[in-house]
Amino acid sequence: MTDYYEPINIFRQCAISVKKRGQEHGLDVATRRVASWQRSAKLNSPTLRKVSDDYFLTKKVKSDYWQVSDMDLSATAFSSVGNLVMVTSNKDQDNVKLYTYAEDPNSMRQLQTITVPGAPITTATLLPAAEFNPTAYVPDHEQLLLTGHRDGIVNLISTSFTKGESRIVKRYNHRKHLVSMANEVMNIDTKHKDEIEQLLANHKQKSNSARAMPVRSIKPWNGMGFVSLINDSLFVFTLNNTKTPQYLNSFPGIQSFAIQTHSNPYLLGLTGTHFGANNIALLDLKKTLYIPDPVIDKEYRKSSSRSVSSDCTWISSCYLAQALGKEVNIWDVRRTDGKPKAKILPNKGVIEHLSYHYETDTLFSSDDQGNIIAWDLTNLDRLEYCGLVHGLDAVKYNMNLPINDSNYSQCGNVVVNGNNNSACTYRKLARKIEVNQRAGTLFSYCDHELGLHRLFSAPVEISLQLSDTETINYESEEEEVMVHVDKLHDNSHENSSILHSDSTTLHSRDFDSYSDNESANTTDNDNELAYMDTFKRPVPAFLDEKVAAYNNPVLSSSSSTLAYGYF
């Protein structure tokens, strides 16, 4: 037994793996396998392409356009589900057309033409077959759709592509509910009863006219019904109940609504002129009919009270995007301070339509000048202000906002430029947009033109053409660095360009020419010092040695020191 403490011998797994050593001439020699990625057979693998410097990826857009209606008649609405597209017009005959498109090759083919009787169509939408079963109403039918008319009627239509037949299976009359609601309100006892009776009498007289009840918007709701907007009244109908709506309320000044389809379809976002200074409110269909007044910030009220909110869309279960004039505000519904989570700065025209693609976290906006812009909101949690990637608007800051490099992101790319010779530009019309969630494509419609837009990453090769350059080889124990240095001009006031091995371009000047020349002008020295201060860093040492390399062509590798990766 030993006279010192010895721990218990417990088996432990090695943390590292050591290769076996071979015996050569009685000495332990470690076997080493030298491999290079240049001799690898996977030169075209995605992993190696990411670290190479001969190309870079850029976002590009591919657009296809089709003429789907007559030049003298404009379409009233369009909708898309899967590879199916519907376009409606205000004609009496053939006012609903269904198309199908294929991505490879890009083609658009007309499936069916439907004539819906009654008043002109003002809006329409396709119902997803996965949520709304068309065979529950008519056997062997493949698609359900809703059409809203000028007289306040909404028709549920079932159609079959194979048989070529269509049928109106349900009809929802909104006008009669608005008239009965006005009669009930007239029985309210108030000191302003005479004025209210006069207003409601005028409202009732207008309600009897078919032209006073256009259906402004229709959206599918919770796989069982739809939400519709007529004038200032919001309806919620189930498809099986045509007599009584599940919900009905009037919101003066309402412009649009958005249904939260992620987790709570009973939560709606509303935009309008009477929803506080921010022109936005939340509506919970499960709670009492009450819209709380938001907390208004004085500074924010001055900048937003003059704008009109035209559209909104849900980004997630907590974030709601709102078009407010030329800006887009992204709200966090969990906050109560009355300030947006992020703001897309003003650009182009007044934004009228919004659409969001959930898989790629891309928000599309359309303005009254025919422009469509895609906003990358992947890092939404860290965003405060968003701007365009290209153009003068990308670098133009609003001096009234606390914008800096840390909270500003250039994430906007122009998909459709409104400066082209299109009908939307001449007539100042906004392109109606809708994202196909399954295919990830964007549909746009303006006047008679239907567009299909797709964003993709395209590789761009890098070709560097350097003239009058010298090559300095720097050898070390670990690697060999090749640095291309442009020749310095004799005129010290001219700029020279230095290209490092990491493809970073730095514009500098010949600083040593001023320090060696005692007769230099004081004004020039001040200008050069001010130019140096813009870098906010000390001048690298290799700039001095670069000048020495030009004056003395013989430069030993041992005396050169390169600040690799300094900038």
Swiss-Prot record:
Q: What's one GO BP annotation on this UniProt entry?
A: cell wall organization
> Which domain of life does the protein's organism represent?
Eukaryota
- List keywords of the entry alphabetically: Cell cycle, Cell division, Cell wall biogenesis/degradation, Repeat, WD repeat
Q: From the UniProt record, which GO molecular function terms apply?
A: G-protein beta/gamma-subunit complex binding
Q: Where are the WD repeats?
A: 68-109, 127-167, 302-341, 346-385, 398-437
Q: Does the keyword Protein biosynthesis apply?
A: no
This molecule's function is given as: Involved in cell wall metabolism and required for the separation of the mother and daughter cells.
Q: Which family does it belong to?
A: Belongs to the WD repeat DSE1 family.
Name the chain's protein. Protein DSE1
Name the species this protein comes from.
Answer: Candida glabrata (strain ATCC 2001 / BCRC 20586 / JCM 3761 / NBRC 0622 / NRRL Y-65 / CBS 138)
Name the gene that codes for it: DSE1
